[in-house]
Amino acid sequence: MEPSSPQDEGLRKKQPKKPVPEILPRPPRALFCLTLQNPLRKACISVVEWKPFETIILLTIFANCVALAVYLPMPEDDNNTLNLGLEKLEYFFLIVFSIEAAMKIIAYGFLFHQDAYLRSGWNVLDFIIVFLGVFTAILEQVNIIQTNTAPMSSKGAGLDVKALRAFRVLRPLRLVSGVPSLQVVLNSIFKAMLPLFHIALLVLFMVIIYAIIGLELFKGKMHKTCYFIGTDIVATVENEKPSPCARTGSGRPCTINGSECRGGWPGPNHGITHFDNFGFSMLTVYQCISMEGWTDVLYWVNDAIGNEWPWIYFVTLILLGSFFILNLVLGVLSGEFTKEREKAKSRGTFQKLREKQQLEEDLRGYMSWITQGEVMDVDDLREGKLSLDEGGSDTESLYEIEGLNKIIQFIRHWRQWNRVFRWKCHDLVKSKVFYWLVILIVALNTLSIASEHHNQPLWLTHLQDVANRVLLALFTIEMLMKMYGLGLRQYFMSIFNRFDCFVVCSGILEILLVESGAMTPLGISVLRCIRLLRLFKITKYWTSLSNLVASLLNSIRSIASLLLLLFLFMIIFALLGMQLFGGRYDFEDTEVRRSNFDNFPQALISVFQVLTGEDWNSVMYNGIMAYGGPSYPGVLVCIYFIILFVCGNYILLNVFLAIAVDNLAEAESLTSAQKAKAEERKRRKMSRGLPDKSEEERSTMTKKLEQKPKGEGIPTTAKLKIDEFESNVNEVKDPYPSADFPGDDEEDEPEIPASPRPRPLAELQLKEKAVPIPEASSFFIFSPTNKIRVLCHRIVNATWFTNFILLFILLSSAALAAEDPIRADSMRNQILEYFDYVFTAVFTVEIVLKMTTYGAFLHKGSFCRNYFNILDLLVVAVSLISMGLESSAISVVKILRVLRVLRPLRAINRAKGLKHVVQCVFVAIRTIGNIVLVTTLLQFMFACIGVQLFKGKFYSCNDLSKMTEEECRGYYYIYKDGDPTQIELRPRQWIHNDFHFDNVLSAMMSLFTVSTFEGWPQLLYKAIDSNEEDTGPVYNNRVEMAIFFIIYIILIAFFMMNIFVGFVIVTFQEQGETEYKNCELDKNQRQCVQYALKARPLRCYIPKNPYQYQVWYVVTSSYFEYLMFALIMLNTICLGMQHYNQSEQMNHISDILNVAFTIIFTLEMILKLIAFKPRGYFGDPWNVFDFLIVIGSIIDVILSEIDTLLASSGGLYCLGGGCGNVDPDESARISSAFFRLFRVMRLIKLLSRAEGVRTLLWTFIKSFQALPYVALLIVMLFFIYAVIGMQMFGKIAMVDGTQINRNNNFQTFPQAVLLLFRCATGEAWQEILLACSYGKRCDPESDYAPGEEYACGTNFAYYYFISFYMLCAFLIINLFVAVIMDNFDYLTRDWSILGPHHLDEFKAIWAEYDPEAKGRIKHLDVVTLLRRIQPPLGFGKFCPHRVACKRLVGMNMPLNSDGTVTFNATLFALVRTALKIKTEGNFEQANEELRAIIKKIWKRTSMKLLDQVIPPIGDDEVTVGKFYATFLIQEHFRKFMKRQEEYYGYRPKKDTVQIQAGLRTIEEEAAPEIHRAISGDLTAEEELERAMVEAAMEEGIFRRTGGLFGQVDNFLERTNSLPPVMANQRPLQFAEMEMEELESPVFLEDFPQNPGTHPLARANTNNANANVAYGNSSHRNSPVFSSIRYERELLEEAGRPVTREGPFSQPCSVSGVNSRSHVDKLERQMSQRRMPKGQVPPSPCQLSQEKHPVHEEGKGPRSWSTETSDSESFEERVPRNSAHKCTAPATTMLIQEALVRGGLDSLAADANFVMATGQALADACQMEPEEVEVAATELLKRESPKGGAMPREP
């Protein structure tokens, strides 16, 4: 084989990878010596590409994994025979892998060829693993030899080998390279790495900031605890971990007798959790962010320093860290996932078709699964076409041949009879009745299974047994009937039927086995539960549900590969864990650590536990302790756990969610598409039914139909993104498809969107319209015109009244929160009771007024017809009743008192924004219904299986040696802490676990807690130890039970719960979109347009005072920025270096450094104040932030100085002398530590520097703005639950060692809220639930009845906590996620699509051209401005000049009369062209449509602004587009003429052919398509430019550099010596700009030019008088004309004939002699001006009227000098005789045609414009109009026979 040609290689690269490799073109040589003909290499190639070889290798890898898993790690490096055997086997694997690697290297070459071995990432991984294996083996041998030679050598020599051995665990990764679907999931995860990296930075940043704050605030506070006096024994209560204490202040005092608080304790968690130095501080903070064990840390800090303010630190940490930043991960992953899928989708129509078929197949498969193979057509049956089996037709043909025969006739009769019977049977099976019968049987089956429970009576067991057999028989009959009716082949086509058959057969098998006594009845009874899956049959008649299930099954596919990846990941970490921790989890204390790594199954369970994040921190603490505690080697262990937790919990588990959200959106669109089809059908029927009605009537009917779903409030119809629509609507491949919703044109949009989404709520005005008085009379007395009623109406609808009531609602809520739950008769409660009377009175009056106004409930629009009003009425009624029932039964009053909590809900009716969020939540709950159903079904199924497996098995005795209840009596001894001297006698108790599986309900409860990931390991180990019914546990009795829990967790917790979350997110997103349903702009377009309309230019302050300017120059330079950046980093490092117990010297150094940094930052502030002046300085929020920090730091320095001065008397706080023995460590007063925070805050300044992080922050703040109403709703939820909690659970006594304790209780309102916040983060909420249930001890101060000391708490706790947890976990947190995913979609969006985050750059760069923020710049600055902005918004600096001009033609922004463009108009035009908003079709019409859309969405947009960005029709605006279009046409014509001149060496006068060719060039080249690069050959143009330079030099004339395309720097020259280029730019950029900005390929940048640049500067004046002299009165005052007048005077002075040229006057110059002085002046000027390298003067026939700066007052340093004659350069004109009157028709036609070709129809239609262009054309090329006309006529004549197709230039 010869080496492949480069073409082949190119092709090969393009082709997608196929799983089966085609024969790759192999490198001719491998390893420099082996050619393709070499027999060894041939053999290797054939082996490596032999399919079984791959399989063998995969199997070997698998075997190796098994071997690694079987290995038993032991403490102290002990070994057993199995392990030694495995060590030997290891060599075998090593040899196999080495051979494989060697063969592949020989076959493919090692490194240097394109397809060499090491060029594939997976091969690199393989190679490293094999290499390390071989290396380890060699080292081991060396070690053995060493030990033999030197027997005394230490054991340490083997250590390095052990470390290397750990690399073996990577071998399972090689499976990935064998399984393609895994690579897809991995790829999308890798793709997300970049945005994830930004988030990781943000998280790291947060962790660092919080760690340093923690270090400053809590350093050394955690080292005191209660010791018994005189001993080192820590004093604790039973069940309580030791915790810090405080001698004084509000920390925890030592209450146990004989104990004292003193230091010397290592700290909580054996000294791992503390803030004593930066490292541990970071670990602690990270643990808090993961929301595991954060409350423990908070409680320890509270115990140490009091609970007044530490909660602020922790709650903000959780809110920012966990809820916000970590949810970003989800946003990014789901974005990436969707993007990957979109990519896959857009890979072509074929793919699309395939996918469509796939979806249909899935659905069909699923439907048939449910409908038992509904494939046969009933008509076919009736005609008797059904063949019994394949052979049917053959028999018939046989019968025809052989003639009639008795047997055959019998067979025929029998078959006919059979056919009829089967047909009847088939009909029966398919009938609704049969279906419902089966459903009924399934329901009975479900009942019989669900009724099983522990200790059930015998008769029930007997009944269940009988029922089981009867039902089994019924199911068997059903199965046989189906088989008969449908035929076997048809029956087994449906998956559901196969499944059914399997269940029935297993049931029969079970009965046979049990009857014959071959097995115990339990084992297989799990199969009975699988029957419950039949419940899914219900979905057949429930489309949305069936779609949901179809989408679930669909996503199971994508999830299968993810599960495989997850499993691989777990295996690797489990094996690594065994290598690291195997056999090491044996500690001094007697407690057994269940989550360990001592064998493979256990290691897998531990890894899985860390993945779910439940209690992962305790597993980590054990790991650290196993390696000697919180000292050097031990701490490194946390790296393993953190990597495992991050990769597993954040990345892999979020991919689950991403897949779920993605598939759900699909399911939604399926459902809505079906709905749409149904609508369509209805519509068709209606239009069929109305043949005689007029069109209008019909359309109104359909309109009504369309509005109908709206009334029902179905939220799902918002997304109709189904393939059919895509194919119809977006035929043109539009890269930005607009969110078009076909068929919905209702105009009755609600004023306010029904969504929690922000934008609208922020913008729309929440005006409440007064409801008119209803027609009917109220209370049968007051007629609508009654004076009293009218007065009531006026009062009720007054804003002051609403606000007054709102105020009272707030006050009454506050009163509820202030009540004392324990002492009912306290003074406070009595006062509050009087207030209560007042509130009730006010609310009653309000309701009476409203009822008087609107009537009670008998007619439409009356008071009680509104749900919110009924709520009001209920609340008031409850208050009134409870006042009346003071004396009677306490329980009733108690319930009524609790109901008062609903008062805050009345605010919902008053605040509109809140009302919409609430409605949205309700909509979400309604749509979630289906998912809840599916989840509940699955949960129920698992609960039934759990009952079968574990009923009655969760009992135990506290004396572990006793196994049954009978034995568990009397007393037993216990040794405290394993110390034989401390003996205690305890009574034995037979304990039932709190969560158990004794009946279906408690099983569902237990499983629910498992699905929230709380406390599931405890339950799991209980299940693993479970033994027989009613006996105690046996350690690790049934490890296989873990499978049940793991499957449940994966299916329910990972999958269903995520789908749940996904559903909420999708619903919210849709709700947000509904209100924009008909506005044709998608979300991104809306945001960008909104930005463009609302943005205002920034002021860019440049001082005039030279000294101040120097300071400003320094402060704004990038070097200064970098210096400050470095200083902040240094400051951070210094802060991080502090630690507990540091030396005096260290203290001294850190104080000095602090002072130094404070001084430096103060200096920075002073310099900036000087540079920007206070007004400019405080205009920037970052500066304000800096200012506050500096002030705080100064206070901090002063305080610490005073403190050191007063150190002798005990520091600052002992000035009063009352200090005595205060320990400064314990003071929780906001001491100097508070001011120390300012040191840390400097860090935050770093955020303003990093680009990616800054964008993140920007979006962050945007999503905060989006949350106000959501936040309000959350506050309300917490408030209501907290008050209920205080009423219901406030009396429970606080007992240390239980969950209701000093830190966690319902006794005050703040405590209750904190407890609820803890539940919302899921911290052991199920423990709190149990601690609040009935039978708890009451608080001694509460008023319980005698004998009811243990009657506190209530079983209402179950409903309370579960409802709260569900609301929080599923709705509230998801609101966060939804808002975040909404705002952060830009992170993963294609960056080439313009988004709102790109638009800030425009503001910043505009400010440099418009430092005064006037909002206008010269239109010639626009090109340079846009070339400085990077795409997608600008053109970027590499955009060739002509392309930039062509783009400007397309943008078409309005040009003001003074030649400037406005800020908003420019930005709007940019956004509009970049996002293709209404750019197609008729331009004026598009403009009108866009105006209408803007008016509709942003109702408050001022008309002035709107006219500025989109000029109204009929406003004959000059636009930048027209301007540049003229330019391009002239430019090309000139170019062509120049080429002609070069060619002939002189100027051809009347050669029409040539001129026609020239015009043709114009047509071709003036087209403004953006995507076309510079037309024509670049090299030709360069030559042309060179020729032009030479020509110019010969003539000895230097023309004005620039014109349109050069550097118009002469107008920028200022009196100072700065290079002219930079009139308005930051001096710092000079150096860079000279080269970079001036190097576009052909032309150079144009810099700001003067307003009168172009003949079109005022095209909206009447062009009919274009031939009138410039002196015409209508023009006299325009700046352009003043400039021309000025020029004329100058010319006259110079003694030169006046050229009559002005914007619209014809340039018929009178010939004259050029004065010598002028040439001198030009030459002088030329020598003065440095010409940048490569700059060329423009072409000789440049259109060049002299343009002059107009002096604008107030421009400050920017106004240009009009006095200096230096800044003029003149152009000589070739004499010309006649002034032409107007453009001739042929030229007009030609120009129009050229414009149309270029896509500028709107300009072609503009007669004035065409005329001006014609004039400019003749003018520019110094030709007679007649010459142009002749050429044009000739050209058009030639064109016409060809049908107008203009020939291209040859």
Curated annotation (Swiss-Prot):
Sequence segments annotated as region (Interaction with calmodulin): 1522-1542
Disulphide-bridged cysteine pairs: C226-C254, C245-C261, C957-C968, C1338-C1352
Motif (Selectivity filter of repeat II): 612-615
Region Disordered, annotated ranges: 1-23, 673-717, 731-758, 1697-1779
Gene3D superfamilies: 1.10.287.70, 6.10.250.2180, 6.10.250.2500, Voltage-gated potassium channels. Chain C
Residue positions, PTM Phosphoserine: S393, S397, S687, S1575, S1617
Residue span of region Binding to the beta subunit: 357-374
Residue stretches of each IV repeat: 1105-1384
Keyword Cytoplasm part of the UniProt annotation: no
Keyword DNA damage: no
Protein name from the UniProt record: Voltage-dependent L-type calcium channel subunit alpha-1S
Intramembrane residue segments, as ranges: 280-301, 602-623, 1001-1021, 1312-1330
Bias-annotated ranges (Basic and acidic residues): 690-711, 1717-1726, 1745-1756
Family assignment from sequence similarity: Belongs to the calcium channel alpha-1 subunit (TC 1.A.1.11) family. CACNA1S subfamily.
Region annotation (Dihydropyridine binding) ranges: 988-1077, 1337-1403
InterPro entries xrefs: CAC1F_C, GPHH_dom, Ion_trans_dom, VDCC_a1su_IQ, VDCC_alpha-1_subunit, VDCC_L_a1ssu, VDCC_L_a1su, VDCCAlpha1
Catalytic activity: Ca(2+)(in) = Ca(2+)(out)
Sequence intervals crossing the membrane: 52-70, 86-106, 116-136, 161-179, 197-218, 310-330, 433-451, 463-483, 495-514, 524-542, 562-581, 634-653, 800-818, 831-850, 867-885, 893-911, 931-950, 1039-1060, 1119-1140, 1149-1170, 1181-1200, 1232-1250, 1269-1289, 1357-1381
Short name of one Pfam family: CAC1F_C
Regions of this protein lying in the Cytoplasmic compartment: 1-51, 107-115, 180-196, 331-432, 484-494, 543-561, 654-799, 851-866, 912-930, 1061-1118, 1171-1180, 1251-1268, 1382-1850
Glycosylated residues, chain numbering: N1141
Source organism (scientific name): Rattus norvegicus
Per-repeat ranges for II: 418-664
Short sequence motif named Selectivity filter of repeat I, residue ranges: 290-293
Keyword set, alphabetical order: Calcium, Calcium channel, Calcium transport, Calmodulin-binding, Cell membrane, Disulfide bond, Glycoprotein, Ion channel, Ion transport, Membrane, Metal-binding, Phosphoprotein, Repeat, Transmembrane, Transmembrane helix, Transport, Voltage-gated channel
